[in-house]
C-alpha cells in the first residue's frame, strides 16, 4: 500500500504506511532498557567523548553485555573489542555510535544488518556543517 501526501514545502511525495505500533514500542523499549549495548567508536584514549561514555558504562557496572567496536583496537578497558558490528555474533538491543559523521550511515547499515533496532548517534558534521553535512543527514532519513 502506498499513501500520497505533501511535505512541509508543499511538494508531493510518497509515504510508506506506518510500521506496526508494537514494533515501535519494542524499539523504544530496547533503547530505554537495553540488555546489551554496542559502542561504535569505543576507545580508551583519555578525554575522548567515547572513552568517557564507555568508561562510565564499565565503571558503573552496566548489568548487560557491553561490546566495544573499534577496527584498530584489540581490547578496551578489559573487554574484547570487535572490528565490526557484525563480528559480535550476539543479539544487541542498542547501538551507541560515537564516530565522525561521514562514517555514521555505513555504521547504521551495519546495525540494521545485525538486527539492532535502536541506535543513538553522537556526532557532529551533519546539517550544521553545510552542504556535505546536509547530504549525509538526508542519507540517514
Residue ranges and their predicted role:
Residues 2-141:
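Catalytic-core regions of core metabolic enzymes
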Amino acid at each position: 500500500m502506498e499513501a500520497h501526501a505533501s511535505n512541509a514545502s508543499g511538494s508531493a511525495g510518497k509515504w510508506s504506511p506506518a510500521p506496526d505500533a508494537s514494533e515501535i514500542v519494542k524499539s523504544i523499549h530496547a533503547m530505554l532498557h537495553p540488555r546489551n549495548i554496542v559502542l561504535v567508536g569505543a576507545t580508551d584514549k583519555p578525554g575522548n567523548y567515547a572513552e568517557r561514555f564507555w568508561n562510565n558504562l564499565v565503571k558503573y557496572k552496566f548489568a548487560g553485555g557491553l561490546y566495544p567496536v573499534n577496527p584498530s583496537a584489540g581490547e578496551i578497558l578489559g573487554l574484547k573489542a570487535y572490528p565490526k558490528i557484525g563480528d559480535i555474533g550476539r543479539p544487541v538491543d542498542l547501538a551507541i555510535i560515537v564516530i565522525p559523521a561521514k562514517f555514521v550511515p555505513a555504521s547504521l547499515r551495519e546495525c540494521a544488518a545485525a538486527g539492532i533496532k535502536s541506535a543513538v548517534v553522537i556526532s557532529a558534521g551533519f546539517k550544521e556543517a553545510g552542504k556535505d553535512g546536509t547530504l549525509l543527514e538526508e542519507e540517514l532519513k
